[in-house]
Amino acid sequence: MALLQIAEPGQSAAPHQHKLAIGIDLGTTNSLVATVRNGQAEILLDEKERPLTPSIVHYGDNVTVGYDAGELASRDPQNTIISVKRLIGRSLNDVQARYPNLPYRFVRSENGLPLLGTAQGNVSPIEVSGEILKKLTALAQHRLNGELLGVVITVPAYFDDAQRQSTKDAAKLAGLNVLRLLNEPTAAAIAYGLDSGREGVIAVYDLGGGTFDISILRLSRGVFEVLATGGDTALGGDDFDHLIADWISEKSGIQPQDDQQKRLLIELAARTKIALTDKPQVSLSYQGWQGEMQREEFNGLISGLVKRSLMACRRALKDAGIGQSEVQEVVMVGGSTRVPFVRDQVGEFFQRRPLTSIDPDKVVALGAAIQADILVGNKPDNEMLLLDVIPLSLGIETMGGLVEKIIPRNTTIPVARAQEFTTFKDGQTAMSVHVVQGERELVGDCRSLARFTLRGIPPMAAGAAHIRVTYQVDADGLLSVTAMEKSTGVQSSIQVKPSYGLTDDEITQMLKASMENAKEDIGARMLAEQRVEARRVIEAVLSALLDDQDLLNDEELSTVKNALVSLDNLQQGTDTQAIKAGIKALDAATQEFAARRMDKSIRRALSGQSVDSL
């Protein structure tokens, strides 16, 4: 059975109220959460005004996340999960082959995925990631003091489907509505506003604490395409720290004797690295030894690692079929790109000055926040980030072969719109959803995209069910259609690419046909609408006669039946006004019948009740 529309999509009570959304950079070493306030993206700080949350989870008597968990890492390494991002979406065999020296107690799950044995039992990487996301969500809700409508979470461009789905599952555990997973390099480019700049090739050089990633993107018509990715999962700022620590041990002649001393030495090395970002030399003190490190010495130590990263850049460019001179912008991401030597070497390699004006630790989260702000509808259409539009209206078939447009043509994507529909017949338990594309008024003149059926609608009177149909088009032009019966929550959905197989010429022809046939289409629509209304009225009267025909005398019954036959004949014709008149005639013929049925219902309802009880 096709659909009968009952409601226009209404605006919220406060359509211009700013909707709360966040962007999360779920990092290997650290994670951040950001939002857009007063038109500006900003990082949300924790209770101690810190922007970063260490991606560390400790399982003890309680679950601890962040800095507090990090302090327990050296004392209780088996229950302190660090860099879980390396494990998510991977099989246990893959994890053990890639990272043979991890201190965790691994347990194989039934599907071959890793579980980590902790003081609180076995936990999956998804659950660990979920704890980090819960921490970030709580931080955001505290700072924003309101309900979050959704989140954009960033993932590496090279993440496969399993890793992306696992990230979504972690977000679900944290109670988050994921608006979109966004590639980290794309988020960084968005933060710099490159999405609205000239088209061309962008390189994103991401050197974090534990990993290095290079991504080559092409911007075309507001859409980022990942041309190639590369990197090194064992190269990052932590390696810089270890090189400095080894240098200090060698210069001082003092080797750390236990884990505590090793940790203190690494912390000293990290402080030295940070200080050398701004100073040409740094004074050092280690267990009674006094020394000094020059920036040139530091550059010499890390030179080999930086060259390794540039070799990965060269391979990525080759994979993309792009020359170094074709790269128009280079975006720096990750705290380790603050090192002046790294910036100089990258600039020399790509033959242009890298973009460094945004804090490289924050740039990905800021881009995610900008995207989230748009996806919840805070930006007007002319400021949409992703500039693709829907070339032809997307609609749904309603009763009588009519088209109800859900998303009009030229709407900027991503976009989501919904309308409510109801059943046409008593006891109807299923509904056919026919998705169409085009500008014409009748289904037969539009392009059919997909069909699916919503089953499990509770049997009720015609018009009593409420089915919400949602059309959502993502940034890649993929249309998801979901139909949900509101009282039970039962739903069904389908995905389709509206642009698949559609040429520019066909779009032009369809638009031209809609303009040329506009008058005839409106007339056909009015006729179809009157036919639908006539059939609805006929169905209702026949059902009433089946139950209460005895309320009419022979003459009255004959009058009603004659009006029914007349309307049935008229609705098979093509005279819209005649059908309209026939509906009015049947309505007039059944008014007394309707009044008697109402009286009967009232008497039945009051049967057996005393006057005092009323």
Swiss-Prot record:
Q: Which biological processes are named by the entry's GO terms?
A: iron-sulfur cluster assembly
In the record, the note on similarity to other proteins reads: Belongs to the heat shock protein 70 family.
Q: Which GO terms describe its molecular function?
A: ATP binding; ATP hydrolysis activity; ATP-dependent protein folding chaperone; unfolded protein binding
Identify the coding gene: hscA
**What organism does the record attribute this protein to?**
Actinobacillus succinogenes (strain ATCC 55618 / DSM 22257 / CCUG 43843 / 130Z)
Residue intervals passing through the bilayer: none
Pfam families per record: HSP70
Q: Which domain of life is it from?
A: Bacteria
Keywords tagged on the record: ATP-binding, Chaperone, Nucleotide-binding
Zinc as a keyword?
Answer: no
Which NCBIfam families does this chain map to?
HscA (TIGR01991), PRK05183.1 (NF003520)
Magnesium found in the keyword field? no
> What CDD domains is this protein classified in?
ASKHA_NBD_HSP70_HscA
Q: What is this protein identified as? A: Chaperone protein HscA homolog
Tell me, in a sentence or two, what this protein's role is: Chaperone involved in the maturation of iron-sulfur cluster-containing proteins. Has a low intrinsic ATPase activity which is markedly stimulated by HscB.
InterPro entries assigned to the protein according to its UniProt record, in alphabetical order? ATPase_NBD (IPR043129), Heat_shock_70_CS (IPR018181), HscA_NBD (IPR042039), HSP70_C_sf (IPR029048), HSP70_peptide-bd_sf (IPR029047), Hsp_70_fam (IPR013126), ISC_FeS_clus_asmbl_HscA (IPR010236)
